[in-house]
């Protein structure tokens, strides 16, 4: 009688182990399934791809206060420049209770104000001067290899545009907001040499210098 009971226990033990092993295997399979879903990384992939398309520069962040009956309420403002590095740029100004939220608002506003900047190679077609309030900025074309000769606010705008060789000088206010808007005003004055020649009814070589004409030809040829 005792031997029969022992034999039955021996036969049922592997079945119990198999059931436990099966449950563990199912749990492992579920864990793999969760890993395949990718979690939050999969959902945020689109946002990261969108960010990589643009060049963002935070020019300045200020803390401002509003005086109310109960005291002062503090918030932050952010001046942001956004561009694609290929001739498109915009400037935005965001305000929020936290710095990241203010920057995000500035980025969204900058994307809504995009405009195209004419370029010749890695510089600008001609000299321009922009003004905004007390800010005055002078931009001059430069030969290849010169680099961006500019201060912080002006440099931020030019880098977002994708200009790599240029000379600049700030002649007015040192306020970063005025300088950025003066730089944008200067860039909006730029014109394509071909459109200037067509408006005047003259050939391109009579409107633009020989070096500029060669640069335009090389740009069309993809050199």
Curated annotation (Swiss-Prot):
The keyword Cell cycle does not apply. Keywords: Ribonucleoprotein, Ribosomal protein, RNA-binding, rRNA-binding. GO terms for cellular component: small ribosomal subunit. It comes from the Bacteria. Gene3D superfamilies: 3.30.160.20, 3.30.230.10. Disulfide bonds: none annotated. Residues 54-117 form the S5 DRBM domain. GO terms for molecular function: rRNA binding; structural constituent of ribosome. Residues 1-51 are annotated as: Disordered. Residues 16-51 have a biased composition (Basic and acidic residues). Residues 1-15 have a biased composition (Low complexity). One of its GO terms (biological process) is translation. The keyword Methyltransferase does not apply. PANTHER family: MITOCHONDRIAL RIBOSOMAL PROTEIN S5. HAMAP family: Ribosomal_uS5_B. With S4 and S12 plays an important role in translational accuracy. Located at the back of the 30S subunit body where it stabilizes the conformation of the head with respect to the body. The N-terminal domain interacts with the head of the 30S subunit; the C-terminal domain interacts with the body and contacts protein S4. The interaction surface between S4 and S5 is involved in control of translational fidelity. Part of the 30S ribosomal subunit. Contacts proteins S4 and S8. Belongs to the universal ribosomal protein uS5 family. This is Small ribosomal subunit protein uS5. It comes from Paenarthrobacter aurescens (strain TC1).
